[in-house]
Every structure is written in structure tokens, then in C-alpha cells.
A protein has these predicted regions:
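Cysteine-centered catalytic environments shared across enzyme families
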Residues: 1-265
Length: 265
């Protein structure tokens, strides 16, 4: 469990590195092993690290590509990163660490935001593309890792936890009355709402892109619907005629999923 945070402002207002440090400290228990910040207006990124993959200083975040045009803060674990890493190396990419974080950076160089479709894991990340002056926020398919953001039409502030967003004095703490109504009706606040106006949860299987002029949120994955789609997912497209075949395939999928999750340093 790590913590990520950051801010994007295109109106010329500077980004305070001290603010990023305060935001990181607000969830330091999420990442007690290391802390880092990156500031290059109009963007600032912060990270608190819990070391799981590659415990060396090479795993320090925020992390960049070779020429510093792409910067990433990442929380989570990518279970198929080793296969992706080998493919990237064969395509000529030079990777300096053994982290899944660096793998995402180079995969983004190849695929753009479509790289999300190749990631098997639990994650939330923020990626700054300095070439296009765009900030991307991404979240895993099932929303295992949290990611919240504040947008008031001028600035974007994001973090793993809402209390880190509230560390920014520019962020309004106004109550969202629609969210309050939902809470009184349902006894909880469903995503993407939060109790604070203009603070939202990034939905599972979604990404946000922020650029000069505004933000947009898109869905890159959703739960398959329909019997045929579910069976294709379970069988890999092969016909299964007996209940025994389904059991064997399901067992193989579960066994493979558990094996992938045993990767750590």
C-alpha cells in the first residue's frame, strides 16, 4: 500500500513542493519506506512508498523515463509486469530498475493510455506527459486501489485519500447536498460522489485526462454482460461441453491468479 497525490494548475500559479510534502505526510502510514516529490509547473506529484517490488533506491518515486518527459506516481502491483517488461526490452526499451512502476512508463510510451488494457493488477496512478501537457489518472478494473480528485474548473488536486486533498488551502470544504441526500437515503455515499462538493472518486475501470481547457473521464473496462461473453472469458474461446470442463477451467484460472499474486521482493 502506497500513497499518491498531486496538483495541476494551468493558470500560471506555482505548485508548492511544501504542500506536496504535507499531503504525503497526511498518509505516511501508507508508505513508510520512502517519500518523494516532483514539481515542474503546471504539475506537482507526490508519493509515499511501501516497498514491495525492487526494494532498492531504483524504485524511488516519482519516477520518469530517460528524458524526463513522462513522470509517474503509482500505488499498487502489476501481476504481469515481468512478461510486459521482457517484451519492452525486446522492443529496445532500456529499463533501469526491476519495478512494475517503470514498466508502466515504458508501456505508456508504446501504447499511450491504451496501456491500461494490458495491466493485470490492482493500481491507481497519475502520469504526467510533458510532451502533450496532459495529466492522466488511472484506476484498476475493480477499484481495489483508491483515487480521489478535486476539480473546480481551474485546478485539479488528487490523492489516495480525501484528507490529503483537504491539506490544500485552495480546496473548498463545501458540503455536497446531493451527496448528503444520498447518504440520508441509502446510509452511505455511492461513488463517484463524496461528502465534499467538487471532490469525486475516480470510478473502477476508468481514467481521467486533464489538460488545458478541462478534464474528461472515460471507462476502459466494465463487467462483461451476457452469457456468451462470460463463457468466452471463462473458456478462452474454447468450447466447453460438460460441467467438469468448467470446473477444471475455473480451477486453472484461480490457481494462476493466486500464483501471480505471490510476486514480491
Amino acid at each position: 500500500m502506497c500513497g499518491i497525490c498531486g496538483k495541476l494548475v494551468f493558470d500560471g500559479q506555482g505548485i508548492s513542493e511544501n504542500l506536496l510534502e504535507v499531503m504525503c505526510k497526511s498518509f505516511s502510514y501508507r508508505g513508510p519506506d520512502d517519500e518523494g516529490t516532483f514539481v515542474s509547473p503546471p504539475v506537482g506529484l507526490g508519493h509515499s512508498r511501501l516497498s514491495i517490488i525492487d526494494l532498492s533506491p531504483a524504485g524511488h518515486q516519482p519516477m520518469s523515463n530517460e528524458d524526463g518527459t513522462i513522470w509517474l506516481v503509482f500505488n499498487g502491483e502489476i501481476y504481469d509486469f515481468q512478461e510486459i517488461r521482457e517484451r519492452l526490452k525486446s522492443d529496445g526499451h532500456t529499463l533501469k530498475s526491476l519495478t512494475d512502476t517503470e514498466t508502466i512508463i515504458h508501456l505508456f510510451e508504446e501504447e499511450g493510455i491504451d496501456c491500461l488494457k494490458q495491466l493485470n493488477g490492482m493500481f491507481a496512478f497519475a502520469l504526467w506527459d510533458g510532451r502533450q501537457q496532459k495529466l492522466w489518472l488511472g484506476r484498476d478494473r475493480l477499484g481495489i486501489k483508491p483515487l480521489n480528485y478535486y476539480w473546480d474548473g481551474r485546478q485539479l488536486v488528487f490523492a489516495s485519500e480525501i484528507k490529503a486533498i483537504l491539506c490544500d488551502p485552495d480546496v473548498s470544504r463545501e458540503i455536497d447536498h446531493e451527496a448528503l441526500d444520498l447518504y440520508l437515503t441509502l446510509n452511505y455515499i455511492p461513488a463517484p460522489w463524496t461528502i465534499f462538493k467538487n471532490i469525486r472518486k475516480l470510478m473502477p475501470g476508468s481514467y481521467l485526462v486533464a489538460k488545458k481547457g478541462g478534464i474528461s473521464v472515460e471507462t476502459y473496462w466494465d463487467i462483461p454482460v451476457g452469457t456468451e461473453q462470460r463463457e468466452n472469458r471463462l473458456t478462452g474461446g474454447a468450447p466447453l461441453e460438460e460441467t467438469r470442463d468448467f470446473k477444471q477451467r475455473l480451477y486453472a484460472l484461480l490457481e494462476g491468479a493466486v500464483e501471480r499474486r505471490l510476486i514480491s521482493d
